[in-house]
């Protein structure tokens, strides 16, 4: 999903010498898989924070795995959004805005076109808004709505800064017009 010209810069999971996984993101030190807090399905004494593998871990696998785990936990469905610590806040450290925005778009497309359609009543996806500027935020909001995702996660103000500006009103108005929860 990431454009070919940016694939070598895309975040990815790599295997460490200890056999565990780590997340490799441009501009960031390696983050071992313990960033996911993979405690789901394990008693406290069984959890080991290092040498963990992402593949097959409870709570983060395929949509089919997610549905099985919902059944095991007695859940009718769940709202899906990325953990800020392991996703959008780290991706923002990618300094080239076009590369960064392509990561956001790839995630939203994957969630809306592949993952949630497996069972849209039980896998309720929330798209991610880029932290760049209001134009980009509104454009991605419109794209997320077309994908059929049910809302958006916003880790910064629509203007991309940590403080609000009057220009943010365009984003809020668009979200209201689209009946899109933020």
Question: Which sequence ranges carry the predicted segments?
Answer:
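Helix-coil boundary/capping segments in enzymes
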Residues: 1-182
């Amino acid at each position: 999903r990431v454009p070919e010209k940016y694939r070598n810069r895309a975040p990815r999971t790599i295997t460490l010498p200890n056999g565990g996984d780590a997340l490799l993101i441009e501009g960031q030190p390696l983050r071992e898989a313990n960033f996911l807090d993979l405690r789901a399905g394990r008693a406290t004494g069984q959890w080991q924070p290092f040498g963990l593998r992402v593949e097959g871990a409870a709570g983060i696998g395929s949509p089919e795995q997610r549905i099985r785990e919902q059944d095991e936990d007695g859940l009718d469905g769940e709202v899906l959004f990325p953990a800020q610590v392991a996703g959008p806040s780290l991706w923002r450290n990618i300094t080239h805005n076009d590369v960064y925005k392509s990561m956001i778009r790839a995630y939203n497309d994957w969630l809306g076109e592949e993952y949630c359609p497996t069972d849209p009543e039980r896998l309720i996806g929330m798209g991610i808004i880029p932290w760049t500027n209001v134009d980009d935020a509104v454009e991605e909001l419109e794209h997320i709505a077309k994908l059929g995702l049910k809302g958006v996660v916003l880790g910064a103000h629509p203007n991309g800064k940590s403080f609000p500006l009057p220009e943010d009103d365009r984003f809020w108005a668009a979200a209201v017009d689209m009946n899109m929860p933020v």
